[in-house]
Amino acid sequence: FPTFNLRRLVRDVVLRLAGKNDKAVRQLELTYGGGKTHTLITLRHLVNDPAKLPKLPAVEEFIQDIGERPPRCRVAALCFDKLDVEKGMEVISPTGKARTLKQPWSVLAWQLAGEEGLKILHAENKAQERETTPAENLLTELLEVPGKEGLGTLVLIDEVLMYAREKVAQHRDWRVRLQNFFQYLTSAAVKVDRCCLVASLLATDPLKSDSLGREIQAELYDVFQRQREEAVEPVVKEDVAEVLRRRFFTPESVKDRDSFRPHVVAALKGITAIDEQTAKQGAAAEQRFLDSYPFHPDLTEVLYSKWTQLARFQRTRGVLRTFALALREAEKWDQSPLIGPAVFLNTPKKEGLSEALREMVTVADTEVT
């Protein structure tokens, strides 16, 4: 959903693509609940063909925050988890022609300009791949192609570490090659009007985040740091309850916020009777529970600040999956007015740990060892 940070990022990117600011390079921080993926998808849909945007409340909210209709842009996506280190990947040119290419810069060139894009990068002006990293001036020329057709240029980059870790393990020289590519690419994006680059460098697979993976990640972060604006986290702690509500419940069941209050008041009556600290908070406590309803605010706080920091949960949607598993089982027996830690317990009179809790124990054990 359009969180404050997501709306701010979308506004900045769209205005850059309209030629109205100089924020050319944006980097996404890891987010809770798959916010990274939703952010990249949102950006693509808003500018790929804005004339055909559906009339949905979320779309209108984005447009209202931007202050104008998004400009039409050519979007190129470097999805490194789909780019095989040996075979490459199939990509589509602006004219709809498919071709399998191996090098990241070739994948970018084909999406932006087809055969002409490959020719721009090739030493002999051929529609073929080159093995070495293209220089900044060539990438600048490539990024300028959509502008000649009256379009903005949006480059989306995802899962860089997935590819980089594997490629560097095979060929050590690719460590410098990738650094150079991203250095040249980010510098080129800054120089091209109506061009924006939005990147996520992390790997979903925790196995890519070993010592070598962390070294590569740090080096790439340094490269992006030189050109990017402040990093953006589309989903922050204050958004967690809304993310969970939208993931786990039907829109109609959580649409009427006024209906939350009687349940919160009733729950707080029991809580304040035994919890002096909450009782002292008065109206502030009521607002906190309202914002988090139907989840106990302490539960969402722990899930966000503790469990999402663990590597195995951090780079997957593990928290959401485990939480959903717990809710499905607890719905059969838990009569509590709020969704709290009890949902992770096993069914009463059933021995052992619940399936959800077993998953959490496995993750915790992995972190410790």
Which role fits each region the language model picked out?
Residues 1-34, 41, 45-47, 219, ...:
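Walker A/P-loop-proximal flanking segment of P-loop NTPase domains
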Residues 118-157, 167-168, 176, 185-188, ...:
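Mid-core helix/loop region of P-loop NTP-binding domains shared across ATPases and GTPases
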Residues 19-21, 50-54, 145-150, 170-171, ...:
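Secondary-structure transition/capping motifs at alpha-helix termini
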Residues 153, 312-369:
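Helicase motor interdomain insertion/brace
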Residues 163-176, 208-210:
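Conserved ATPase-coupling elements of RecA-like P-loop NTPase cores
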Residues 4-6, 26-31, 38-127, 133, ...:
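P-loop NTPase motor core
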Residues 9, 101-104, 108, 174-185:
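Well-ordered, non-membrane alpha-helical segments in soluble/globular domains
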Residues 64-89, 94, 98, 102-103, ...:
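Conserved P-loop NTPase catalytic core
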